[in-house]
């Protein structure tokens, strides 16, 4: 089914060519060198027949527009073969038309390109007037896209400002049940609102300019911290030395008192029981001697 229209058109073109040749040979002498029909004419007619056959397979809206663009392409091909600049510009316009195929309402898509091509052939200096318009549209799209990105980045800083305005509005409007408020309480409320506004400003500054400490600043902070630690140690050092000295003196006194008590107790105990002490000492010595003798190894008989 798909090849029937093209084959019929091709056969009709061949019949028409054959009839023209027969008429020329009958009326005037036919010479091969004077043949007006060339191979290029056959190719161009075959291409037009193929274009007409494509119309049956396209929707009604796209068929007319696509056939015009294809015919225009085939017409321009022979003219553009010897001019590379014109070929590049034609390819740009055709690529743009294919991109704009979905938007038929666009003014650029609905231009009369056949008439415009004739105008371009007459005035070759104005051939490049279409491209700046199209590039301008692309630049506008890029600018809108970048503007949206910038707006998304600034949303973080806009939120604290809105909260600040809400706080000011709440502080300015006093409800009826708090109409009878003392001036001290009002001052406290104002101070709180100021603190909140300062916090919001700090948040905005942090979001806009993140903290970036340089090496010199870091070194200065480390030096300040070390100096402060040395000062605190020098201030707190006299107290432990005094405490350690007092502790040592107390321990020495306690030892001296303990030794004195020990000597006193033993001396009194010896005075009260001198005989018992001597007897117990002798008895222990004798017992030790007997135990040593009994533990000696005796020779076997």
UniProtKB/Swiss-Prot annotation:
- Name a Pfam family for this protein: DUF4640
* Protein origin, superkingdom: Eukaryota
Start-end of Polar residues biased regions: 170-181
Q: Supply the InterPro entries for this chain.
A: DUF4640
Q: Where is the composition biased (Low complexity)?
A: 226-237
Residue segments, region Disordered? 167-186, 225-244
What is this protein called in UniProt? Uncharacterized protein C12orf71 homolog
What is the native source organism of this protein?
Mus musculus
């Amino acid at each position: 089914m798909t090849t029937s229209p093209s084959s019929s058109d091709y056969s009709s073109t061949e019949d028409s060519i054959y009839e023209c040749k027969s008429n020329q040979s009958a009326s005037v002498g036919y010479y091969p060198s004077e043949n007006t029909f060339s191979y290029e004419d056959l190719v161009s007619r075959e291409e037009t027949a193929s274009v007409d056959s494509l119309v049956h397979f396209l929707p009604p809206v796209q068929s007319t527009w696509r056939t015009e663009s294809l015919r225009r392409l085939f017409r321009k091909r022979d003219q553009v073969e010897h001019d590379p600049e014109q070929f590049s510009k034609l390819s740009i316009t055709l690529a743009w038309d294919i991109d704009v195929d979905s938007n038929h309402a666009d003014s650029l898509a609905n231009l009369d390109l056949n008439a415009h091509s004739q105008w371009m052939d007459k005035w070759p200096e104005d051939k490049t007037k279409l491209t700046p318009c199209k590039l301008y549209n692309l630049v506008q799209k890029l600018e809108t896209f970048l503007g949206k990105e910038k707006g998304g980045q600034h949303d973080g800083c806009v939120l604290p400002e809105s909260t600040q305005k809400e706080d000011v509005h709440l502080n300015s409007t006093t409800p009826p049940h708090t109409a009878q408020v003392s001036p001290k309480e009002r001052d406290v409320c104002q101070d709180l609102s100021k603190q909140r506004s300062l916090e919001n400003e700090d948040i905005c500054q942090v979001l806009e300019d993140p903290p970036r400490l340089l090496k010199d600043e870091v070194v200065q902070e480390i030096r300040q911290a070390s100096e402060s630690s040395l000062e605190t140690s020098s201030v707190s050092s006299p107290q432990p030395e005094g405490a350690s000295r007092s502790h040592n003196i107390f321990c020495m006194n306690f030892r001296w008192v303990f030794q004195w008590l020990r000597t006193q107790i033993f001396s009194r105990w010896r005075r009260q029981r001198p005989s018992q002490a001597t007897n117990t000492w002798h008895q222990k010595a004798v017992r030790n001697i007997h135990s040593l003798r009994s533990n000696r190894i005796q020779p076997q008989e």
